[in-house]
Amino acid sequence: MLGPMDEFPVHQIPQPIAWPGSSDRNFYDRSYFNAHDRTGDIFLISGIGYYPNLGVKDAFVLVRRGDEQTAVHLSDAVDQDRLNQNVLNYRVEVTDPLHSLRIVMDETEGMAVDLTWNGLFDVVQEQRHILRAGTRVTLDAQRFAQLGSWSGHIAIDGKEIAVDPAVWIGSRDRSWGIRPIGEAEPAGRPADPPFEGMWWLYVPMAFDDFSIVLIIQEDPSGFRSLNDCTRIWKDGRVEQLGWPRVKIHYTSGTRIPTGATIEATAQSGALLRFEVESKLPVPIHVGGGYGGDSDWIHGMWKGDKFTERLTYDMTDPAIIGRAGFGVIDHVGRALCTEGSKPSVEGWGLFEHGALGRHDPSGFTDWLTVAD
């Protein structure tokens, strides 16, 4: 079970790098990327994950253009070489750790990608994220995030899309630890009290002089179990932004947001107000493999050298019905006003999900929608 990493002094416990320190089946190690051109016409989301206790590695590319959302999935048996991240035709080349990398997917199911990332700001280490169901830890993860630009090209069914770093922007994160993956486990005794829902907001955005990474999670009563809100300056300074107040603006009759108003506090005491708008929504549980996806689940064994392509009509009532029951990633635009200073424009990701009951939003159960 030895691999190339075992040549280096990077071990944390007395066993090969390929053996996770935890025997939990849900141990994972994953990268997530998104890219868009600030128009709302296209949004690409991609990721690669290793699940050593399940013997699986997989990757995906998800693209929305207009009313069509297309997913390419790749899955294979895990290997021991963590220095060369790859799943079949998909690979991630880390050219300058924490600063630049390259994603390549050679033609697979009619799609190909060659994108180079350059960080616009330093990475920021997020707070450790822990969730429990009863006495069991169901999520225990560490993550870092970064805002950056993209260059290269995307090809779909023979049509090439040029990716100009002057306009293409996005965010990425690396996370590892424990989270639900693969096939569902037997539930055992029903939870008491039962799981009633979760409210989630994640907003990484890049402005000219700074980036922000806002992460907020609340339980059904509105109690905030995660509040990790920072501003990253060009010189590397990281500034905490206090306890933001958030108002999500939902489309009437749905839980799909059109935007949000976020008020935070700079270290100077000045009010920071972000007016965020959605330019294009991508439900990441529709082909992306995230919670509630009925078509693709991260870490599930699909057999050796598995690939597939799925295409969704986002106007299909069945897909619309699915979209409201998961987390949605949006091409995000924001105007930031700090005190009496002129507003500045930023772009990035606006990710939100309101699942189940959330008293502050007026959602009394799993089916309540916005007025």
Model feature map: region roles:
Residues 1-371:
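Structured soluble/peripheral alpha/beta segments that form catalytic or ligand/cofactor-binding pockets
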